[in-house]
């Protein structure tokens, strides 16, 4: 389980996260939505130790993150898929996928490559194993990034707006891969996204944020058909029209 307990985050005097209390259960698919600047990405980055909280606690598998242990804990339990793919340009797709398992988890090259091909098959890119990232489309690069996160076999995968940097025509291929993972895997997923169709189909629970706070929390069927707050109704009214 990942827990945020009374988490506050400041950038200077700007109060970015305001008393966030949130838990993510093992195997859950949690989707965080809200307008730009609402604190969604900061929340998910705090879960992974990429941002230090100003006050409160982040707890991963009953371990409280601090500046001394957060790298060790997050390397063990959390994988992250970013808006931008962060692939190593000088390495092939296969090398990108095997680097962390071999270097950090001390897997043999044979075992790491077997795992890499397994997940390249999941994302539909086995034929791209020996090419370099620059030869791939944005959608293909993001699918490689997802495969890389799966190769680490960590129990939590955090997705920070994984389609926001993609051309519209490539967004669906990435969403399809994420849907496949959600249906076939016990992996816990936390997804920050503006893709409402994906949220409806995949989420076990929706978190709606505004101005650094959790405004509403509900199951998708209730959230999308009958939101409890006026702010969520206004947000959905605008975003579902587009």
UniProtKB/Swiss-Prot annotation:
It is found in: Cell inner membrane. It comes from the Bacteria. CDD domains: ABC_HisP_GlnQ. Residues 2-236 form the ABC transporter domain. ATP binds at residues 34-41. Keywords: ATP-binding, Cell inner membrane, Cell membrane, Membrane, Nucleotide-binding, Transport. This is Probable ABC transporter ATP-binding protein PEB1C. It is a peripheral membrane protein. PANTHER family: AMINO ACID IMPORT ATP-BINDING PROTEIN, PHOSPHONATES IMPORT ATP-BINDING PROTEIN PHNC. The gene is peb1C.
């Amino acid at each position: 389980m990942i827990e945020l307990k009374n988490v506050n985050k400041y950038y200077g005097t700007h109060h970015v996260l305001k008393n966030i209390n949130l838990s993510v259960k093992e195997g859950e698919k949690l989707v965080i939505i809200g307008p730009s600047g609402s604190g969604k990405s900061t929340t998910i980055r705090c879960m992974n130790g990429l941002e230090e909280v100003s006050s409160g606690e982040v707890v991963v598998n009953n371990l409280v993150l601090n500046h001394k242990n957060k790298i060790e804990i997050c390397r063990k339990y959390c994988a992250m898929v970013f808006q931008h793919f962060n692939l190593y340009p000088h390495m092939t797709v296969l090398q990108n996928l095997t680097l962390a398992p071999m270097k950090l988890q001390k897997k043999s090259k044979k075992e790491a490559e077997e795992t890499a091909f397994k997940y390249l098959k999941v994302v539909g890119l086995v034929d791209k194993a020996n090419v370099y990232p620059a030869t791939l489309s944005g959608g293909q690069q993001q699918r490689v990034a997802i495969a890389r996160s799966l190769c680490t076999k960590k129990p939590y995968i955090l997705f920070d707006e994984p389609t926001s940097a993609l051309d519209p025509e490539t967004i669906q291929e990435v969403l399809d891969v994420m849907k496949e993972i959600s249906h076939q895997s016990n992996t816990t997923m936390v997804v920050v996204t503006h893709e409402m169709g994906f949220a409806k189909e995949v989420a076990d629970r929706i978190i709606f944020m505004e101005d650094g706070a959790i405004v509403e929390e509900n199951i998708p069927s209730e959230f999308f058909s009958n939101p409890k707050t006026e702010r969520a109704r206004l947000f959905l009214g605008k975003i579902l029209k587009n």
